[in-house]
Amino acid sequence: MQTFILAGGCFWCLDAVYRTLDGVQDVISGYIGGHTAHPSYDAVCTGATGHAEAVKVVFDEEVIPADVILDVFFTLHDPRQLNRQGADVGTQYRSAMFPADAEQEQLFRDAIARAGDLLDGTPVTTIEPLGTWHDAEDYHQDFFAKNPGQGYCNAVAVPKVNKVRKSFAQYVRAA
């Protein structure tokens, strides 16, 4: 098993997309990259904690390659936007990757370069020290599945899920 920690806007969207992929064993929403010891959602939303909303994606590389996990990441958010994704604005919504070791850091650098080759514009995605991971509150875990009628999810997460299902169809879980 391999674990990546990725931040790219609201963690509800990242969580929703990665849960659709075969080989993804777990997705945990949380906070990372800040200076507050025990961050809460309300505190992180202020932008004052330094933490990013992120997901911890645990996956089986024999089922889904690491490069695909990373290409999905760059498909489901706009890595050219600094400290925002759509209407979500602040450093808590930054595009960032948190490698566990030098091998992951190189995978992340290669993925940023691939994304840059495909985009009209340069990714602003940062590679940041791993630091301490903080699980988000329980109600944020698998939020999209638990709240299918929620307006934000319908407006923002559904199009991202559909885009990834189309672009990475061979890796989508069978229904």
UniProtKB/Swiss-Prot annotation:
Among its keywords, does the record have Oxidoreductase?
Answer: yes
Q: Which residues form the active site?
A: C10
Q: Which GO terms describe its molecular function?
A: L-methionine:thioredoxin-disulfide S-oxidoreductase activity; peptide-methionine (S)-S-oxide reductase activity
List the catalytic activities from the record. L-methionyl-[protein] + [thioredoxin]-disulfide + H2O = L-methionyl-(S)-S-oxide-[protein] + [thioredoxin]-dithiol; [thioredoxin]-disulfide + L-methionine + H2O = L-methionine (S)-S-oxide + [thioredoxin]-dithiol
Q: What class of enzyme is it?
A: oxidoreductase
Any single Pfam family the record assigns to this protein: PMSR
Q: Which UniProt keywords apply?
A: Oxidoreductase
* BP terms from Gene Ontology: protein modification process
Q: By its UniProt entry, which InterPro entries does this protein fall under?
A: Met_Sox_Rdtase_MsrA_dom, Met_Sox_Rdtase_MsrA_sf
Q: Where is the signal peptide?
A: none
In short, the EC number is 1.8.4.11
Q: What does this protein do?
A: Has an important function as a repair enzyme for proteins that have been inactivated by oxidation. Catalyzes the reversible oxidation-reduction of methionine sulfoxide in proteins to methionine.
Q: What HAMAP family does the record tag this protein with?
A: MsrA
Homology family: Belongs to the MsrA Met sulfoxide reductase family.
Put simply, this protein is called: Peptide methionine sulfoxide reductase MsrA
Q: Which organism is it from?
A: Clavibacter sepedonicus
